[in-house]
Amino acid sequence: MTYEQRLCRIIVSPYNIGQNRKNEQLPIHSTGTEGEKDMQDFIRIHEDDNVAVALRPIAPGENLTVGQYQVTVGEEIPQGHKFALKPIAKGEEVIKYGFRIGYAKEDVAAGGWVHVHNLKTALGDLLEYQYEPVASGLKESAHAYFDGYRRADGRVGVRNEIWIIPTVGCVNSIAQALEKKAKKFVGGNVEDVIAFTHPYGCSQMGDDQENTRKVLADMIHHPNAGGVLVLGLGCENSNIPLLKEQYIGEYDDQRVKFLQCQDVEDEQEEAMKLLEELAVYAGAFSRETVDASELVIGMKCGGSDGLSGITANPTVGAFSDLLISKGGTTILTEVPEMFGAETLLMNRCETPELFDKTVHLINDFKNYFTSHNQTIYENPSPGNKKGGISTLEDKSLGCTQKSGSAPVKGVLAYAEPVKVKGLNLLSAPGNDLVAATALAVSGAQIVLFTTGRGTPFASPVPTVKISSNSKLAGHKNNWIDFNAGSMVEDKSKDQLAQELFDYVLAVASGKKVKAEEAGFHDMAIFKQGVTL
């Protein structure tokens, strides 16, 4: 039996930071005196690991005791990077999170730095998977509440904004001009006016054109928008009559207005009349107490470092479990960053049918890569590597920590709205803007974005930036909303998860995140094919 086949059969739940297989506390180690322990030194994540992770820079010559191992560090180990706990021979598996993250390219001495210079991926082509279901011990917990906007169709938004949605990139400049003019309508219960520009809607074929139309329709129905102006040109492929007939379906004609620019003499004058009507309609909504079971939260990471899978991502995973225990919904995406850890998700699928859909989710993305003559493991990024992530397996095993321990209840195609409460998997790439947009399009009212490097981007919905380390949180305070780096200093995962849950309730009740305060709003549609 190959390692890939053996990995597909193994039944292992995602690790919990600070716990081993027996659910006993696994210490984060410090070599300082009692008064110097506000910054810990290293962590061995799983009892089977032959590497540990530095939680602060470790100097050459430092002597460390890691469980049964006595290690003298041979060279400087940057924060978030790995060092060997025992000699690792060339060709031997390097184990982290209890799983193989690659093979040693050369002999590595105990205490040696383990990174891209001496570690290579073990990922290859498509695999065959066997369903070995793992039961979840997640239980219901007490109700929680936030103040949201109940829409006429029963759905709940966490913002009451007016959205201008172009059907085609040709009218982007008009949409942006209208956004500026319509800011005068902001006030009272109208929280903002936002134009979501994009370059698509014409000169597209096949799946690309279909995806654009689905995304536009989903955005029109998103509950964070109290009013929507759909702005068309008139000659585009994704024109307003086609969208109405085949994609949008039923809509509230007080909430959604349409304008085709080629049909009127002065499109800005006519658009402002419609926007004023939308402002009156949206202004009639007010926040009301809503059960947290109505929340749909997207989960994404980017600019990850070696601490992302130890602090920020497990915190989000624990948050996900907490929200789901209260009847809420979370969505996990960025499929290419599941490669190498996919069986942890597959075996948590509630039914064989969901398992089969998850297999297709993974293999369809692998086929997408190979159809473009690209390798499936062309990841991590330069920033990931600088932060301590060495291979895609290393990245994926950390990335999937965001899923927590809940069973998989749904598997969504790109631009497919979420229908089932609980944990859902969504088909979308790893690209930050494209994936975050995909989460919003599928119904997320808020996106949680973990990062070890930092990024200012936004998405169509409030995007909470969660740092994996305290240095980033201090250095880029204008970007970071929540610091999970304190897990290696003075807080537990459960404590941070509860704090994050409380913060999300505050955001859902109107608190602006840093990107919103800066006025940032982005939308990026997934492009796969040719442009005419």
Model-assigned labels for residue ranges:
Residues Y15, Q19-D38:
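Short, Lys/Arg-enriched N-terminal segments with co-localized hydrophobic residues
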Residues M39-E416, V420-I446, P456, P462-L532:
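Metallocofactor- and cofactor-centric catalytic cores in central/energy metabolism, strongly enriched
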Residues E4-Q5, H29:
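Short, compositionally biased terminal leader/tail segments enriched in small/polar residues
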